[in-house]
Amino acid sequence: MIGSMGLRIPRATSSLLGRAVNAVATNQSAVAGASIAAQRRWQHYLMPLRDNFEQEGIRNFLSPGSVNMAYTEYQTFILEKLNALVVGTDFEQKDTKSIVLATARDPELAHVFNHASMAHNNHFFFDHLSPVPVKMGDKLFYHINENFGSVDTLRDEMIGTAVSMFGPGFVWLVRTQLPGQPVALRVMATYLAGSPYPGAHWRRQEMDAQTSIGSSPQGLSNGQRFFERSAAGFKGNKLEPTAPGGTDLIPILCLNTWEYAWLREYGTGVGGMGGKLAYAQSWWNMIDWAKVEEEARLETRILTGGDSSV
């Protein structure tokens, strides 16, 4: 029987405490080292977004919870799938864009293409957003007016294309240039995980902003050709290695129309409230136009009369 004296618990000596602290530190270092090693082993891991989007959200556009779902959770899911598909292959140490271009013409690697392209597109979308409104630069403003008539026309075209898409995908603003022709800007849409890059043209799953499938005879023929070559591709036919015409095309902005990006925040849009339209309209106000202009690599124009203009 112990009685009122109770049990005596000896104090830990300083040496014991020191060993314990060192053990904890060693264990933490081992965990951190394992994490770094895992990232090095797996080339494709979640890239942190700038401006603390995950913690603070994107003002007047997406809450932290929506960013977490649309980027942190979804991107992690896609990258885990991609890593499982490419482990032990040459693609393991290639970036997602390189994988997209390398697999787009091989029907047997369609599953690899889809995951790589989706990861690339989703990150591209978030990487061109800003926590505060950014003024459009003069050079980009000039080229948009040259190609679309006005900034408002470009806005309406991108938002209208997004809203009219029946299935999920991405709406892109691209810089394009044919051999011997001046630089042009155009809007294009890709369905599902389709890619805008010329090297992946057979898997663009494209709907041109000028003609949606089914809206005109030309649209019907475009849609028919897409489905025909998709069916042929999955029979094992190899597709030609480069895009016809040698078009130089660079995506400089995109809008994600997949429901995981907007449904949580904006709802279905029933009754005319919220929905994809409200999401697209809010997106336009938070574009990082400085980044768009930088990636567009636009040249200064010289107007008649000797006046220089961007």
Swiss-Prot record:
<protein>
    <recommendedName>
        <fullName>Small ribosomal subunit protein mS42</fullName>
    </recommendedName>
</protein>
<dbReference type="GO" id="GO:0004784">
    <property type="term" value="F:superoxide dismutase activity"/>
</dbReference>
<dbReference type="InterPro" id="IPR036314">
    <property type="entry name" value="SOD_C_sf"/>
</dbReference>
<dbReference type="Pfam" id="PF02777">
    <property type="entry name" value="Sod_Fe_C"/>
</dbReference>
<dbReference type="GO" id="GO:0046872">
    <property type="term" value="F:metal ion binding"/>
</dbReference>
<dbReference type="GO" id="GO:0005737">
    <property type="term" value="C:cytoplasm"/>
</dbReference>
<comment type="function">
    <text>Component of the mitochondrial ribosome (mitoribosome), a dedicated translation machinery responsible for the synthesis of mitochondrial genome-encoded proteins, including at least some of the essential transmembrane subunits of the mitochondrial respiratory chain. The mitoribosomes are attached to the mitochondrial inner membrane and translation products are cotranslationally integrated into the membrane.</text>
</comment>
<dbReference type="InterPro" id="IPR019832">
    <property type="entry name" value="Mn/Fe_SOD_C"/>
</dbReference>
<dbReference type="GO" id="GO:0005739">
    <property type="term" value="C:mitochondrion"/>
</dbReference>
<dbReference type="InterPro" id="IPR036324">
    <property type="entry name" value="Mn/Fe_SOD_N_sf"/>
</dbReference>
<comment type="subunit">
    <text>Component of the mitochondrial small ribosomal subunit (mt-SSU). Mature N.crassa 74S mitochondrial ribosomes consist of a small (37S) and a large (54S) subunit. The 37S small subunit contains a 16S ribosomal RNA (16S mt-rRNA) and 32 different proteins. The 54S large subunit contains a 23S rRNA (23S mt-rRNA) and 42 different proteins. mS42 forms a homodimer, in contrast to the mS42-mS43 heterodimer in yeast, building a large protuberance adjacent to the mRNA channel exit in the mt-SSU body.</text>
</comment>
<keyword id="KW-0496">Mitochondrion</keyword>
<comment type="similarity">
    <text>Belongs to the mitochondrion-specific ribosomal protein mS42 family.</text>
</comment>
